[in-house]
Amino acid sequence: MRIALELAGQNKTYESLALKFFEHYIYIGAAMKNMGGRNYSLWDEDDGFFYDVLRYPDGSFEKFRVRSLVGIVPLYAAETLKMDDIEPFQEFKTNFLWFVNNRRQLTESCCHYLELEGKQQYELTIVDNKQMRRILERLLSPSEFLSDYGIRSLSKYHELRPFVFGHSEVRYDPAESENKIKGGNSNWRGPIWFPTTFLIIDSLRTLGA
């Protein structure tokens, strides 16, 4: 969305694309908190973390309680839209405000209006303050995600407590994997990824601002 608005400064066609990205963001954020209109959320209140969810043919759901980067990614989806910044883009501004005002059941959970120093702006974020604090408790814990060199792709919690589903398991295994699938690659089993660590830092700066 931000890239599309930047391009819209040279080509107004990109305004409609920016709006499309905004609407998709809202739809995805709302679905994460109310899957299939059944009031089932990817967020787990007991664990304070986001999980993947499996939906069975009978309509029931089951969370995959794997503490991985998947549960941290919602932090990335944070952006600030200042009304002064979108003033030059009248098509985007008009449709943006219409969507915010007429789709409140969707936008109220991930699009928040603020006034700071007399300036109007909207904060776009999937996580609320309470969820962010609970995620950070795990993210900044050396016994979970925080290592001396960055953020682990899988919590160290799973070193002694692997997640088991059927005949498969996910265990913290940051070196060469015991499983030879894909040549023994263990990227999702604990190693540090430089790009994701950067994205986490950048997202926290955005949320903090």
Question: Over which residues does each language-model region extend?
Answer:
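Acidic, mature catalytic/reactive cores of soluble proteins
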Residues: 1-209
